[in-house]
């Protein structure tokens, strides 16, 4: 008795341990979703699956049970009365297993489609063939097709059950003797027809009926056809294929009746004829369609396909939100006058003279402070700095976890990044280096931007958990040879109770969490610190932009991310990057200190986000609840902009004839991305791979020019604003034909503006401008001289901005010594308008040389504090400059950057020589 009790206790404990191990992930998910405030979102899926599982299980179980019940007489005849009761138990158990597996598979794969179906929101647009609202294709048709597939699968399962039972019972008992009143299963008088003839007749009839209905549903898929010259149903699809599908559907209905009757009457000829007829129709359809396409449509393709091309143009433009672009014609004037520059001096003041790649390289050399920090990315944003609207580069200083070798350092000690580097986009120092407004540790802030808490616990590179509030504290930031510590006082993380210590030791497969004496009951474990993974865990049904950016808000740091709703089910819209409908419907804000995540709806007209609002109650907030100062940092997402640009290369036209003849196809402008070494000029570094950013280099080291965030002013506007610009060429040519701009300031957010240039004129595109630079004898001579001295020449971003009815071209040149720790510095500015091109040390000199223009304000764009070479204005200024150069040389020496050290010493020598001559 005692042994039985002991065994029972041991088995119970063992079961509890197994259940605990199996449910570890579930328990942690429940705690984590509760911490972030979205527990209802987590349970939405589970509740939906459970709600679906029960009725689907009952349906499966009842259908199979009823079917088996119809076989009871045949089974009893095979096994006899004595064995029938035991056989019934096996059938019941098998039915349970099959029903559980079938219901589980259906519920776990179809729950989302069912929620979309029941919460569908109309688009208010119908397709031109079936006149169905777009919501039918996006929310309803996928579920209906899946359910039909499930029904067909169930019929096949029932057929297999019949065959398995028939064979299993036959092999089990082999040959039964007539004296036992059991029929011989192998006798000619008792085959499978007599065993389950009526049942199979019903199944065959239902299967034929389902196949017929599936062809009717298949007709709706013609709106995604790729047969014709445009995406979506074409002439052949509508006039031939659709008719065949209807005929096949009718034939299947007739066949279902014929099959049912024929099986019952043992007449197989009608079955063969009906099935053969359907097979002939199925084979004949593509043959007739190909014949029609080749011999009817092709000779008259323009006339026959014209309406369907129009459908594709309209649908694609609406689906990618490019149907309301403000298009303007521009005839560029090749001469920019000084008066025109003075009228647009705010554009000149904000010309972008820094490029992301070289700037990030400089940040990594100068602003890391210690090797356990890293800068993953440098993003463009704008702030009101000391009362002036200013565009800046911002890069957060995160912890480099790859440099951590011990568990304590990686998870307990180095828990967070610290601060950021911020520099002006439109200016550099006298040495061509970034003009910082925030830098160093602790943060040196020369702006009126309030940053009280610069700590970053959640970021782009934080892929591991950390445990905070431990004995000994966390490393905060270095000051000389000492280290400052910090104890986390935020709201993020889960309390490390004894239960959780055991739980996370199992989950992370690391006993140190349980055994470490540094962890107390007040400690917290912070999970999902990578901001992309964090938001994906909460809302995996959204697509996220590859470039989150950090914002200073209310004295702390927050991340802003763009999220998209998308589908590939929009009728007649040609897919790009796997989607054929997309909206930037959500802005996500993640607190870098606490990890709080807020989802704000920015497009209330998007049916997909409105469907999600009905499904996930409490997940999304209205935009009106977002703090106003955060709205000032909205950016038009670059991934979406580049996707729209790709679509526009073909779908910028409204005339179906032009699309058919391909006489007006565009390409996004190319740019040389490598010259004399590593490319550092293109785009934001550290961008995540995304379905929306897949530009690739060609064999000539050319890639599509990435859209650039610039501060500029449209010809018809009064105020400067941040915009995203992209450039287009005629297909196969390099002359620029259009400029696309996305607006993002204030009420203009989301507006797209396009300037079209006359195609008969040669308008320099980015790559033509780059070629012109390299072919100019004065510029190429200077560049060759630098390259000959062992320096690496790096081109910055090519900027093309409209100034009223003219175009101004800008490119910067960086020099970088060929040494491991050297830093790129901006040394020359190339400026061009019309046929004139100049190269100078800074914007001011380039403007003076090109236009004889000197702004009334001093040194706005670059080299703000520069004293021109050979013009030392006073002894004090010369001494100050010499002292500054000496300090920079010493700093370069400490960093082991001997190339930069030598450069500073040479400059110092020049100044001292000039001073001695005076």
Curated annotation (Swiss-Prot):
It comes from the Bacteria. InterPro entries: UPF0182 (IPR005372). It is a multi-pass membrane protein. Keywords: Cell membrane, Membrane, Transmembrane, Transmembrane helix. It is found in: Cell membrane. The keyword Transmembrane applies. HAMAP family: UPF0182. This is UPF0182 protein CPF_0011.
